[in-house]
């Protein structure tokens, strides 16, 4: 029986975490996209549907980025890959999540969720930083950190 070190166990956990998060967030994006295309048009204005679909698109792009991060995790500089994966998740929560909240506010006809748009750009910054860290992780030859 092969003994697994704590370090490789931790790396496997991170690798698996990014892949499972990416797969789950991708599935959720497909479901939300279907809802936006078929059900949402009946309850909110067209520009709100477009904002919602933008959130869905960016969620899907970054779910795929999480899958990529998990798949390349063992072959790149892991500290930067870890940071990239976390930034992608933060970006999905802030960017896509805020667009979903804005849509919910319009559907419920409440102004209390209108301020959610303030955090949307922060999610965009997290996405950009995530891609830059993924680039750095791929460029650096060392696998362990």
Predicted regions located by residue number:
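Polytopic transmembrane helical bundles with strong interfacial aromatic enrichment
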Residues: 2-145
């Amino acid at each position: 029986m092969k003994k697994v070190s704590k370090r490789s166990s931790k790396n496997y956990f991170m690798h698996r975490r990014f892949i499972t998060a990416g797969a789950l967030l991708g599935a959720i994006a497909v479901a939300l996209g279907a809802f936006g295309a078929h059900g949402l048009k009946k309850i909110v204005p067209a520009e709100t549907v477009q904002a919602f679909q933008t959130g869905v698109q960016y969620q899907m792009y970054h779910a795929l980025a999480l899958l990529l991060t998990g798949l390349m995790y063992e072959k790149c500089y892991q500290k930067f890959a870890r940071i990239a994966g976390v930034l992608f998740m933060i970006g999905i929560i802030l960017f896509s999540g805020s667009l979903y909240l804005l849509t919910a506010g319009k559907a419920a006809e409440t102004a209390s969720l209108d301020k959610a748009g303030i955090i949307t750009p922060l999610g965009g910054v997290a996405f950009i930083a995530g891609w830059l860290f993924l680039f750095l992780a791929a460029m650096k030859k060392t696998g362990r950190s």
